[in-house]
Curated annotation (Swiss-Prot):
Changing M460T: Found in a patient with tubular adenoma and rectal neuroendocrine tumor; uncertain significance. It comes from Homo sapiens (Human). Pfam families: Activin_recp, Pkinase, TGF_beta_GS. This is Bone morphogenetic protein receptor type-1A. Its EC number is 2.7.11.30. Residues 177-532 are cytoplasmic. GO terms for molecular function: ATP binding; BMP binding; BMP receptor activity; metal ion binding; protein homodimerization activity; protein serine/threonine kinase activity; SMAD binding; transforming growth factor beta receptor activity, type I. The gene is BMPR1A.
Length: 532
């Protein structure tokens, strides 16, 4: 009977302990007392060692907001830590609380990190009522990287928007100002044009104006005011060519066709030089391209350099030979007229209104034009050199352009040409003229045979040869364009072959003069009864 009583007592104690353990809620970590039964606070009689927390001393802590049910006078008992905590809720209000913390997990809870969205701070201690004096403070507000980046992006976007708006306003003002200036210039131009129409009488042709200037003027071309008037009244029709200097247009002045050479602004030196040469006294010749006017047109934002000349619809000798063949009479007419033009350039005319000797320096088939009557005229004088015999001075143009490498004389290619004397420039022109005669002779039909058109040295150098390519062929190997065997069987071509060979001789002193070439061709023209 006593044993049964003991078993009942033990069973009751066990059930009491179980009920105490299961009755703890989730917040017992913070406000649980951690109290144990008397039997739990002692070692078992069998000598079994209890857990470490069973040996820790119990603390009395101050509690407020986290008091357990058995708290007395705002105090609680625990074997863990006393704590004080301050929290901020979703509305931004702060709450300060304190209480007891159980031993289990207390180290982790005391090192608790606040959440990113809700701030809180917890402080722990291990002496009686120590948390009564703890005053935890909330951590400072930290701006997250995303929020910080958003601010930067917002500032950047606003700055960009302001800059774009400012640029739009500036561009609009600039365009409006330019538009007003353009309208003003156009009105002024139209007003000047009306005045100019009255300046040149209606019915006057270009030939009439030029004849008048030749008979009553200085022989250097139309007066500048007339030139500017003509340039203003030109109507551009279509582009007919383009080169390294600019473009060539076919235009009309009072119904008459004219050629308008529009120079790039970078080629102002070439425009100035060519204008200067054309306006040289006594320069006009039937085998030199007829000069009409020169002018600079434009406003502050654009500039056009005009050179207005006679228009020849057959184009250049280069274009003509590619699509047409020649008989001996046509060949001699082309060669003789070109020689006449070159002779006029090279010849100095003495007198009070004399003409200086001029060397072309860029003679080639593309710079010789074909007139309606089948004769030639020499064009493109942008590189021309003048010689003043009174001062013995060689006037070389100050521009960056150079001649065409394919047509350069040996002394130009190997840089042995004496630039301080005028005669070497003349002899270099003669070499180039010999190559042009070769181009013509290839297209002359004899015995029903004719060669296709080719440029000089077509089979010896690339299509765009370098100085080294030409120097190797012309100076080192001393080669010249190939000649067909049929030329020797025709009297006319045989004479032309002899002439061109004397033109392209390696030694400049051995070459013919332009006057000698002209006289030789004149005899051939006369023997063939060619009408010039």
């Amino acid at each position: 009977m006593p044993q049964l009583y003991i078993y009942i007592r033990l069973l009751g104690a066990y059930l009491f302990i179980i009920s105490r353990v299961q009755g703890q809620n989730l917040d017992s970590m913070l406000h649980g007392t951690g109290m144990k039964s008397d039997s739990d606070q002692k070692k078992s009689e069998n000598g079994v060692t209890l857990a470490p927390e069973d040996t820790l001393p119990f603390l009395k802590c101050y509690c407020s907001g986290h008091c357990p049910d058995d708290a007395i006078n705002n105090t609680c008992i625990t074997n863990g830590h006393c704590f004080a905590i301050i929290e901020e809720d979703d509305q931004g209000e702060t709450t300060l609380a304190s209480g007891c913390m159980k031993y289990e997990g207390s180290d982790f809870q005391c090192k608790d990190s606040p959440k990113a969205q809700l701030r809180r701070t917890i402080e722990c201690c291990r002496t009686n009522l120590c948390n009564q004096y703890l005053q935890p403070t909330l951590p400072p507000v930290v701006i997250g990287p995303f929020f910080d980046g958003s601010i930067r992006w917002l500032v950047l976007l606003i700055s960009m928007a302001v800059c774009i708006i400012a640029m739009i306003i500036f561009s609009s003002c600039f365009c409006y100002k330019h538009y007003c200036k353009s309208i003003s210039s156009r009105r002024r131009y139209n007003r000047d044009l009306e005045q100019d129409e009255a300046f040149i009488p209606v019915g006057e042709s270009l030939k009439d104006l030029i004849d008048q200037s030749q008979s009553s003027g200085s022989g250097s071309g139309l007066p500048l005011l007339v030139q500017r008037t003509i340039a203003k009244q030109i109507q551009m029709v279509r582009q007919v060519g383009k080169g390294r200097y600019g473009e060539v247009w076919m235009g009309k002045w009072r119904g008459e066709k004219v050629a308008v050479k529009v120079f790039f602004t970078t080629e102002e030196a070439s425009w100035f030089r060519e204008t200067e040469i054309y306006q040289t006294v006594l320069m006009r010749h039937e085998n030199i391209l007829g000069f009409i006017a020169a002018d600079i047109k434009g406003t502050g934002s654009w500039t056009q350099l005009y050179l207005i000349t006679d228009y020849h619809e057959n184009g250049s000798l280069y274009d003509f030979l590619k699509c047409a063949t020649l008989d001996t009479r046509a060949l001699l007419k082309l060669a003789y007229s070109a020689a006449c033009g070159l002779c006029h350039l090279h010849t100095e005319i003495y007198g009070t209104q004399g003409k200086p000797a001029i060397a072309h320096r860029d003679l080639k088939s593309k710079n010789i034009l074909i007139k309606k009557n089948g004769s030639c005229c020499i064009a493109d004088l942008g590189l021309a050199v003048k010689f003043n015999s009174d001062t013995n001075e060689v006037d070389v143009p100050l521009n960056t352009r150079v001649g065409t490498k394919r047509y350069m004389a040996p002394e130009v290619l190997d840089e042995s040409l004496n630039k301080n004397h005028f005669q070497p420039y003349i002899m270099a022109d003669i070499y180039s003229f010999g190559l042009i005669i070769w181009e013509m002779a290839r297209r002359c039909i004899t015995g029903g045979i004719v060669e296709e058109y080719q440029l000089p040295y077509y089979n010896m150098v690339p299509s765009d040869p370098s100085y080294e390519d030409m120097r190797e062929v012309v100076c080192v190997k001393r080669l010249r364009p190939i000649v067909s065997n049929r030329w020797n069987s025709d009297e006319c071509l045989r004479a032309v072959l002899k002439l061109m060979s004397e033109c392209w001789a390696h030694n400049p002193a051995s070459r013919l003069t332009a006057l000698r070439i002209k006289k030789t061709l004149a005899k051939m023209v006369e023997s063939q009864d060619v009408k010039i």
